[in-house]
């Protein structure tokens, strides 16, 4: 049986994480609307958006370019829950700076929704689950915040920070799965795939393009 593993995300961090775990996915960015719905909490939001992203790719017809006996589509969505406030991607330097002034010296919960869809012979099986990791931030000085924001790294990442880049020095403690902080929990993903009858180790070391046999 040939398998095509699709990452429905343009996140470099998620791609690096999968590659480090021995999986070489096909990357198909989702065009889903990632707007936050009124009254939606972090768990509901990331669950909905991860599913929406996966189905956006599935329904786009893009998978037809990668024929395989079994198609696996993985989509994720991450936000930082800071005292009940949902922080996605700041997009602007000023917003990232404002967020960091609230975040420094405090804890937040990085919430990542994961959606896995497995398609075999036209039959779709899928599952959505949530990963949550408590992150403690260092008490940064104003100068450190300015320098970090000026680096450009915070603008395009959930919660305006990374753990695997410049922001790693500003994380003093993690309670939970550290992979989840990068936007994709490998232990959670493994369990989801097992629930859908996919053996994790069967996905290792696929040739470029995400096809395995």
UniProtKB/Swiss-Prot annotation:
Q: Does the keyword Cytoplasm apply?
A: yes
What does the UniProt entry say about where the protein is found? Cytoplasm
Q: What is its EC number?
A: 3.6.1.9
Q: Name one GO cellular component term.
A: cytoplasm
Swiss-Prot/TrEMBL catalytic activity = a ribonucleoside 5'-triphosphate + H2O = a ribonucleoside 5'-phosphate + diphosphate + H(+); a 2'-deoxyribonucleoside 5'-triphosphate + H2O = a 2'-deoxyribonucleoside 5'-phosphate + diphosphate + H(+)
Q: Where is the active site?
A: 77
Q: Does the keyword S-adenosyl-L-methionine apply?
A: no
Q: What class of enzyme is it?
A: hydrolase
GO MF annotation, one: nucleoside triphosphate diphosphatase activity
Mostly located where?
cytoplasm
Q: What keywords appear on the UniProt entry?
A: Cytoplasm, Hydrolase, Nucleotide metabolism
Cofactor needs: a divalent metal cation
Report any one BP term from Gene Ontology.
Answer: nucleotide metabolic process
Q: Which NCBIfam families match?
A: maf
Q: Which family does it belong to?
A: Belongs to the Maf family.
Function summary: Nucleoside triphosphate pyrophosphatase. May have a dual role in cell division arrest and in preventing the incorporation of modified nucleotides into cellular nucleic acids.
**Under what name is this protein listed?**
Nucleoside triphosphate pyrophosphatase
